[in-house]
């Protein structure tokens, strides 16, 4: 499963280019979308990005709610430590804003995959059936966990050459043993050609070793 976060005005073009490359390989994308990013960008005010998301979702890519205000690196991850009542307020606001824009999803991924116990506890009452964390994929209606560590480029994680090489090796090991591969990249990093190529190369390695592409909707 490949996911992309931080798609907004300045990153939409490189994200679209990366997605076209993967689409040619039959790889769908899970789009991690929040109504706000860094407190400065607002999906409601960006009609072009909304249309981009609508077209991609209609074509088979997935929408995953990525918080209320996805913070830039340096700030604490939004849902990492929230107690249940605060998580409920933020999630309720995020769901309402996204639904007003015509987007709905039963899947939640907190920024940087850091999910507090309080957040996990309130997700079912808000209609979510899946939650994604650093540990894996939480199936909420059965209270089970599909263990699968997320491999991330950017968004608070590494993006250097050695880190990208480490991720490719991890993808290869997981694919060889038939495990679940979760690969994510920030669209901020797709602006950089070398980083985009290395992430695409990691996807190619997984495909060559028999990994079956899917989105989080299909788990």
Regions inferred by a protein language model and the residue ranges of each:
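Active-site beta->alpha N-cap acidic-glycine motif
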Residues: 1-59, 196
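A conserved mid-domain beta-alpha-beta active-site/ligand-binding segment of alpha/beta enzyme cores
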Residues: 144-194
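Hydrophobic faces of well-ordered beta-strands that scaffold small-molecule active sites
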Residues: 2-4, 29-31, 63-66, 105-108, ...
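Surface-exposed, active-site-proximal loop segments in enzymatic domains
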Residues: 40, 72-83
């Amino acid at each position: 499963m490949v996911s992309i976060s931080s798609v907004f005005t300045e990153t939409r073009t490189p994200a679209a280019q990366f997605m076209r490359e993967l689409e040619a390989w039959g790889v769908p994308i899970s789009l991690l979308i929040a109504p706000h990013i860094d407190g400065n960008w607002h999906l409601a005010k960006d009609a072009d990005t909304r249309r981009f998301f609508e077209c991609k979702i209609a074509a088979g890519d997935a929408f995953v709610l990525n918080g209320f205000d996805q913070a830039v690196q340096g700030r604490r991850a939004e849902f990492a430590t929230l107690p249940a009542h605060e998580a409920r307020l933020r999630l309720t606001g995020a769901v309402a804003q996204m639904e007003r824009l015509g987007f709905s999803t039963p899947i939640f991924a907190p920024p940087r995959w850091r999910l507090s116990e309080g957040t996990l506890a309130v997700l079912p009452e808000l209609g979510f059936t899946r939650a994604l964390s650093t540990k894996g994929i939480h199936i909420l209606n059965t209270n089970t966990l599909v263990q699968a560590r997320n491999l991330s480029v950017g968004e608070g994680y590494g993006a250097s050459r050695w880190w990208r090489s480490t991720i490719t090796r991890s993808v290869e090991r997981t694919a060889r043993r038939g495990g679940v591969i979760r690969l994510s990249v920030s669209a901020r990093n797709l602006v950089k050609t070398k980083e985009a190529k290395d992430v695409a190369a990691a996807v190619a390695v997984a495909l060559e070793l028999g990994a079956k592409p899917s989105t989080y909707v299909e788990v």
